[in-house]
């Protein structure tokens, strides 16, 4: 690969995708982006947009033509929605990217996955990539992302050099998902601690995750990382509810103190899921079995492999970055 690289970022207008795009631009690379809509602020910086569906292989082939690498970030996230949508976007979309890389001779693929692919309802404390994929899925997001990751691993047999990255709980400036939801629920009085409130989780600043994606490409070029999956994080777990309450305090909100036992929250989630499915209600249920479990259990992983192969390191101190972000949210 030359220094003047041409790369494709699927989902490049999203939270993580945009951070990757900005790093590629900073290196002087030619950047293409696929997505459902054009982002004018990126086109003015020279980004070439290809608007269309990720599951349309011909569309992805056109976008990938002449590229030297693809960062496949696009996905349907969330814990609720039509199963067919998760299949089409997360599985079908990933297969389209793989097929496009093969057809257009793109040698390198960095796939954004998730630790949810190993979800089994239990706590993880320092677990590594030897963990098997989950089986008893509680949401289609985790199930379809696991299948997508399997397909990426299988694709290396045909000569594609690829790896999958599993960042846990991505957050940071411009986060459109996690923090806005937490703040909205806190303001409405609907936020509760699930479980005993002492569970530890990994968190990943968006800059840490974006840096790791570019490092993964360099690792593939250097002959490392091919066929591998890597957990990503800041490298030190945090107590989830301490983290959330520090965010709330910095944003000028009261800390959450009300507790709901996990069995109660889990049963509530099952009931709400059934209600939403039966009556085909719009939006996500306010609680699901998957969310209840994630909010109450330990989820932190050994990132030694990413440190070794990708030179993973946090882009910012976790608590300092959280305080800065909370202050920005308070003044917004």
Which residues fall in each region the model found?
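Conserved Rossmann-fold NAD(P)-dependent oxidoreductase catalytic core, especially the SDR/UDP-sugar
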Residues: 92, 96-140
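Conserved C-terminal active-site "lid" loop/helix of NAD(P)H-dependent oxidoreductases
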Residues: 206, 245, 268-313
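Substrate-positioning beta->alpha
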Residues: 147-148, 176-181, 195-218, 227-228
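NAD(P)H-binding glycine-rich loop region in Rossmannoid oxidoreductase-like domains
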Residues: 41, 47-92, 100, 120
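Active-site Tyr-X1-5-Lys
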Residues: 137-163
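Mid/C-terminal beta-alpha module of Rossmann-like enzyme folds, strongest
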Residues: 219-285, 319, 323-326
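Amphipathic terminal alpha-helices
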Residues: 6, 301-309, 313-332
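N-terminal Rossmann NAD(P)H-binding glycine-rich loop of SDR-like oxidoreductase domains
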Residues: 7-27
């Amino acid at each position: 690969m030359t220094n003047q690289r041409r790369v494709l970022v699927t989902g490049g207008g999203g939270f993580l995708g945009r951070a990757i795009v900005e790093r590629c631009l900073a290196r002087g690379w030619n950047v293409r982006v696929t997505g459902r809509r054009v982002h004018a602020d990126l086109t003015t910086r020279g980004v070439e947009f290809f608007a269309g569906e990720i599951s349309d292989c011909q569309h992805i082939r056109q976008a990938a033509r002449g590229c030297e690498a693809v960062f496949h970030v696009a996905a349907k996230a969330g814990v609720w929605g039509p199963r067919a949508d998760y299949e089409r976007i997360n599985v079908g979309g990933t297969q389209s990217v793989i097929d496009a890389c093969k057809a257009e001779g793109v040698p390198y693929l960095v796939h954004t996955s998730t630790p949810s692919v190993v979800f089994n309802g239990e706590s993880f404390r320092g677990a590594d990539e030897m963990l098997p994929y989950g089986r008893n899925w509680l949401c289609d997001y985790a199930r379809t992302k696991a299948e997508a990751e399997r397909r990426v691993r299988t694709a290396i047999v045909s000569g594609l050099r690829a790896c999958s990255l599993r960042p846990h709980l991505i957050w940071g400036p411009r986060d459109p998902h996690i923090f806005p939801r937490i703040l909205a629920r806190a303001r409405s009085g609907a936020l509760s601690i699930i479980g005993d409130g002492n569970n530890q989780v990994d968190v990943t600043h968006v800059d840490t995750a974006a840096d790791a994606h570019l490092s993964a490409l360099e690792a593939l070029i250097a002959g490392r990382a091919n066929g591998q999956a890597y957990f990503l994080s800041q490298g030190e777990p945090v107590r989830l509810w301490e983290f959330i309450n520090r965010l709330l305090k910095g944003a000028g909100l009261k800390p959450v103190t009300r507790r709901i036992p996990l069995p109660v929250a889990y049963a509530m989630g099952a009931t709400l899921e059934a209600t939403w499915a039966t009556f085909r209600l719009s939006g996500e249920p306010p609680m699901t079995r998957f969310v209840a479990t994630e909010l109450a259990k330990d989820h932190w992983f050994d990132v030694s492999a990413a440190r070794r192969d990708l030179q993973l390191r946090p882009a910012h101190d976790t608590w300092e970055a959280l305080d800065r972000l909370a202050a920005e949210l308070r003044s917004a």
